Amino acid sequence: MDKQTIKIQISCEIGVRYLIETTTKIEDIIGYNALFNSLQKCKKGVGWKSTTGYYIHNWNTELLKMEEELSDGTYQKRKPKFFMITEPKVREIMSIHFRDRIYIRSFNDNALYPQITRSLIPDNFACQKGKGTLSARERFRDFIRDFYRKNGIEGYALTCDIKGYYPNMNRKFVKNMVTQYVDPLTDKLIQAEIDYHPGDIGFNPGEQTIQNIGILALNKMDHYIKERLRIKYYIRYMDDFVLLHPDKEYLEKAHCEIKNILKTQDMALNPKKTFIQPITNKIAFLGYDYRLLDTGKVIATVKPESITHAKRKMKRMMLLTLKDKRRKRDVDVYFKSWKASLRF
């Protein structure tokens, strides 16, 4: 069967059989109410687009049709579209049809996300409710302050970045990994979702399911660092993470251990972005440079490239606005959100 048109077999009989084994109910994923709630979330900010306008206008008919197709196993996801972005780096992004996004949102919000997040460490900050870049930056700043109170300025930081995080993910590893964290029904659906993505190695970031896989993929490493290596000051945001410790040799040991763990997942650290340095040096994390002064004060400054990126994006958006291909409101919203992200 063509992976692009793979059928997601989730008949009501299958759902009933799994009710005995799991807390996830099929109605919580493909029921009308679940799909309606998902639609309300998916249409935010995109209702003006022509590609979604028809579906939103005929939402009741379309939701009933989707519910029926999902129940009898005739639902087929449409072929995704691909496009390139150049900022902050050149990469290909996959975009799925609005109709399919509704099912994906319902599946993730009502089944996958609640199950995988139960086992995550508190200092894993990516793509989770109540977390994000702002809270991650605040947490990292608090880490540095607390480190100073206990160790002074004598310490080191191991900054790490994974080379090609999503593109290099091992599909077989991901399938086996997810099975360990979810119930049988959710596992059946997530396996179908993984098979839907084209290619044999890696994933294309641009879909909620893959983002959730990205949250979970390094969970084993997270627990190893926190519980086996007992490094208190460890924080991760997707594939960027930092470890603070007073002993440089211990961080070198941790570096080797991390490389070994990643090797079992066919991943590797980016040598250009992975290094150990004194804690008083500038430590880069999530678009900011952190500097610990002798007095214990922590100075956080926006990285110059982050400002350059924002200026370029606003310039492109304004050019599209002048050509009537973009609304001026979108530029204002982006500027306000970017400005707000600088406050912490």
Locate predicted features.
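Right-hand nucleic-acid polymerase module
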Residues: 3-6, 96-97, 101, 105, ...
